[in-house]
Amino acid sequence: MDKAVYPVAAYAFLALFVLATVFELFFAFKERTLYRKMVKPWCVLFLTVFAIVFLPNWHGALIMLGAFLGCVGDTLLLKKGHQRYFIAGAISFLFGHYCYIAAMLLYASPSLAPIHYIAFGLTFFVLIASLIVPTMKITKSKGVGAAGALYLSSLIMVPLIAFVLLGVTGQNYFLMIGLGGLSFLCSDCYLAKTRFIKHDRREDFYIMGTYLLAQFLIVFGLLLCFA
């Protein structure tokens, strides 16, 4: 496994991520929408650059791609009230989750047997089947509901796989990744609630707080696995 490098530049971008996150959450709490939107795309972008500088190999590139797709999703979701941007953003996040899942399985592959992959696949399809009716009812659309079931199932698979791999490999960093996956799940479920059911005051503060925590835990946990 390649050794990670830790140049000053990597920690500089991590510091920029933290700084941008502080500003983002401050503006979200104060409900300064314009300023919050100006800062939002930069948060995960700094985390993306941190990933590839911290681990400049193809493992780092895969993790970076997952974070970058999150950054693209962040930018697309700035267009509130536009269905096509919302769908495009969700697709970007979806493939970002798949990058994270691929990175986890890649790391754990020496410890996995075929039965593990079969179990993951069956669990994924059971989740889709069990969620498709509720998501259709919430979104009041068959197409959006079906897509929502696919997205939510993929999102659930991130912490589920992480916790399974924690037990299989004994790698403690999977606990960090699993907690990040749960935080991502909280963020997106609350986002769906505010979009399809009821808006809340300071909703962006809670959405972005859990989301940025999730991205950090997942990305940094994966980087440390391969370091």
Protein language model regions, located:
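Polytopic alpha-helical membrane-helix bundles and their juxtamembrane interface segments
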Residues: 1-227
